[in-house]
């Protein structure tokens, strides 16, 4: 039987909406609790150096207010390392970060930063925190992750999400080959960035991928159909992608 794929829901943009006017509404913790009820397997949040959405207080409140595993995305800096070691989330995903970017634009250059990343990864692992690296689906980067003893990688699916036709097919093959390589090296494979109802099934169908992290699309879709419905439909599509008899699955389940 094909193993169920996990869904991590990123709640950053609940905080983005809150911060547009200030105050406390909408509450990221409440969103995380609703995500759990809707079928999420974990909660992901990115504490940026400029605190443009999630704040330090949000991180504290999430620790207290949720029961799902918390995956903290962060830059590989001493400040963020100190915060991670203080809070000890279930997992930390190291990501590249530029102050001028609207969102994460690409994968971490693990191969070019081995010397600086190695002590950060080692300290996080020593604290019992699962470490992942957000990287491009590239052999050099995957082998660098292995050299850093990172137990998990998250493959950047942004280029796939922005592609069409032949380029889309090529990006999917690239992701599949990267996932197979990582699994052969005993690295757990996650994926995320730009995934939607329209493009998630081919990625979720890749058996080597254990988890997808999805945020912006789910929060945007929630404006129209509600957060729980938004997440439940994504969960449904991911399950459909992993069903051994996809036709039978679709017949037995009512599409949301």
From Swiss-Prot:
InterPro entries: Aldolase_TIM, PyrdxlP_synth_PdxJ, Pyridoxine-5'_phos_synth. Coiled coil: none annotated. One of its GO terms (biological process) is pyridoxine biosynthetic process. 3-amino-2-oxopropyl phosphate binds at residues 10, 21, 194, 215-216. Pathway: Cofactor biosynthesis; pyridoxine 5'-phosphate biosynthesis; pyridoxine 5'-phosphate from D-erythrose 4-phosphate: step 5/5. Signal peptide: none annotated. Its EC number is 2.6.99.2. Belongs to the PNP synthase family. This is Pyridoxine 5'-phosphate synthase. It comes from Zymomonas mobilis subsp. mobilis (strain ATCC 31821 / ZM4 / CP4). The gene is pdxJ.
């Amino acid at each position: 039987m094909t193993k169920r794929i996990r869904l991590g829901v990123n709640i950053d943009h609940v905080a983005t909406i809150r911060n547009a006017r200030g105050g406390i509404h909408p509450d990221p913790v409440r969103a995380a609790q609703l995500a759990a009820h809707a079928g999420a397997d974990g909660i992901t949040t990115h504490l940026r150096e400029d605190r443009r959405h999630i704040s330090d207080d949000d991180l504290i409140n999430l620790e207290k207010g949720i029961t799902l595993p918390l995956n903290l995305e962060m830059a590989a800096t001493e400040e963020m390392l100190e915060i991670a070691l203080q809070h000890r989330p279930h997992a930390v995903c190291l990501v590249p970060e530029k102050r001028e970017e609207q969102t994460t634009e690409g994968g971490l250059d693990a191969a070019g930063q081995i010397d600086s990343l190695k002590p950060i990864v080692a300290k996080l692992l020593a604290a019992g925190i699962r470490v992942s690296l957000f990287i491009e689906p590239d052999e050099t980067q995957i082998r660098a992750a292995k050299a850093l003893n990172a137990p998990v990688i998250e493959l950047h699916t942004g280029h796939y999400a922005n592609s069409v036709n032949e380029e889309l097919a090529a990006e999917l093959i690239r992701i599949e080959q990267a996932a197979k390589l990582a699994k052969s090296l005993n690295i757990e494979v996650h994926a995320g960035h730009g995934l939607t109802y329209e493009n998630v099934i081919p990625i979720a169908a890749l058996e080597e991928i254990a988890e997808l992290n999805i945020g912006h699309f789910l929060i945007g879709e929630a404006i129209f159909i509600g957060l729980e419905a938004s997440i439940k439909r994504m969960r449904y599509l991911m399950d459909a992608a992993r069903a051994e008899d996809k036709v039978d699955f679709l017949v037995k389940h009512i599409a949301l």
